């Protein structure tokens, strides 16, 4: 199997402004218009409710819509393999049937009801797609064993491998062979099945770097021949996947950088270094998925509290406001999910914890209403504001008359800083509604683990 080795302070106020009728410097045509100021919410059906079903999750849709969620990403909804299964319920990513529905979650009509309800309430809904491997009891194992990668030394089908073709401990899955044209075409047809049968709006592709860019170019073009607005997210940081017409790639490096800055093993200069690399390697119109949590991080690397501590909201503000960013919220993040959810067993989210939905709704509304913060090249240029504190990151973004200025303090103490390079204007404090003046240079005080977001002008 050929693998890719390419390196790849806050109160209760909300403001709004009208959306522009025209967009200058619009991105490539493959980005759907509805995605330009969208956010994403990852849904873990198994752990979301005590029932762990589509129907039970569906009752949460009005709450999520009120919070401002746009795109629902459902972790895999297909049946999970039994052979070599890990744990009692198994991994969502061990797919037994690409076209089936996991009976743990409900049936075909339950899923169709969820998709229809989501669309009626204004959401887009995408599903996880796992192209790299299947369960050991997938029908292809007996019907088309040539679809799988066989170890040249032993002739045996191998366990799932990473996107550098290295062995893993994924003993519950078998590796597919992306040098087999029939298998690749079968994958495309299975993806089309979900678009045609259930009208899903796109796919989050697991381990998208495990296939060739040519495969994804052909596949995505094929999918867009059926629905030009299908949305494609790659779980990968390989820049070339944008050239294959993925709308968005993962910001893994930025996530780990936030963990380090919050944990004081790095200062904010590393953010500038990261942005310089991104500007060099990634297209200006490519969306980047920024997050402080997701299913991988929560289950395997610890909670947000463990990794980021009291800086969670400060870090998330960067996920909302940074250049090219689309912010992601994971299931339970809006109640401060305080445990690592078990991956192979039932482990229901505790929704009785104090709600942080007010913060998240204001943050998402900021993204939605400020044209300077729009996704990809829809948004405005980002300009650094210099400070004399290595724990404070500050910048402005500008689109037309719209200015968004952000100060984030990763220190556990209140700080008074000197700054320079701001845009001298009259602003509104987004989170308090108070009027504020900001000169080009001066001093400003920020609360511990806090942030200040100032807005000016129309979107």
Regions found by a protein language model. Give the residues of each.
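Short, solvent-exposed turn/loop segments enriched in Gly/Ser/Thr/Pro and often Arg
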Residues: 73-87, 128-138, 206-212, 235-240, ...
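Active-site-proximal helices and loops of the catalytic beta/alpha 8
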Residues: 24, 28, 190, 196, ...
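Short, flexible loop/turn elements at secondary-structure junctions
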Residues: 45-49, 78, 102, 131, ...
């Amino acid at each position: 199997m050929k693998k890719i080795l390419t390196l790849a302070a806050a109160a209760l106020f909300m403001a709004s402004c009208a959306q522009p009728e025209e967009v200058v410097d619009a991105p490539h045509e493959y980005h759907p218009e509805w995605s330009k100021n969208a956010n994403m919410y990852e849904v873990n059906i198994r752990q979301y409710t005590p029932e762990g079903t589509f129907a039970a999750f569906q009752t949460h849709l009005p709450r999520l819509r009120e919070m401002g969620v746009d795109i629902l990403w459902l972790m895999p909804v297909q049946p999970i393999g039994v052979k070599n299964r890990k744990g009692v319920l198994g991994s969502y990513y061990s797919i037994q049937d690409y076209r089936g529905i996991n009976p743990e979650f409900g049936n075909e009509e339950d899923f169709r009801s969820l998709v229809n309800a989501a669309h009626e309430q204004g959401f887009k809904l995408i599903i996880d797609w796992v192209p790299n491997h299947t369960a050991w009891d997938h029908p292809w194992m007996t019907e088309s064993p040539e679809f799988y990668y066989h170890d040249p030394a032993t002739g045996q089908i191998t366990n799932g491998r990473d996107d550098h073709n290295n062995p893993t401990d994924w003993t519950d899955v078998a590796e597919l062979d992306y040098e087999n044209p029939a298998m690749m075409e079968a994958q495309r047809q299975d993806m089309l099945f979900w678009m045609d049968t259930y009208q899903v709006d796109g796919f989050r592709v697991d381990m998208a770097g495990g296939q060739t860019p040519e495969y994804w170019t052909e596949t995505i073009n094929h999918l867009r021949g059926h629905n030009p607005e299908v949305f494609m997210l790659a779980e990968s940081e390989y820049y070339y996947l944008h050239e294959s017409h993925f709308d968005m790639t993962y910001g893994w490096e930025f996530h780990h950088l936030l963990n380090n800055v919050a944990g004081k093993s790095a200062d904010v200069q590393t953010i500038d270094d990261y942005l310089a690399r991104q500007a060099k390697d990634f297209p200006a119109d490519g969306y980047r998925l920024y997050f402080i949590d997701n299913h991988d991080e929560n289950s395997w690397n610890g909670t947000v509290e463990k990794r980021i501590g009291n800086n969670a909201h400060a870090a998330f503000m960067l996920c909302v406001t940074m250049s090219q960013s689309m912010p992601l919220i994971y299931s339970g993040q809006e109640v401060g999910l305080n445990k690592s959810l078990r991956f192979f067993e039932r482990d229901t989210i505790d929704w009785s914890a104090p709600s942080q939905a007010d913060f998240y709704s204001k943050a998402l509304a900021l993204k939605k209403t400020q044209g300077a913060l729009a996704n990809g090249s829809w948004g405005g240029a980002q300009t650094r504001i210099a400070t004399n504190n290595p724990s404070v990151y500050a910048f402005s973004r500008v689109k037309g008359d719209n200015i968004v200025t952000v100060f984030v303090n990763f220190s556990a103490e209140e700080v008074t800083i000197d700054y320079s390079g701001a845009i001298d204007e009259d602003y509104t404090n987004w989170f308090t509604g108070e009027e504020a003046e900001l000169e080009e240079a001066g001093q400003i005080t920020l609360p511990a683990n806090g942030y200040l977001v100032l807005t000016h002008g129309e979107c």
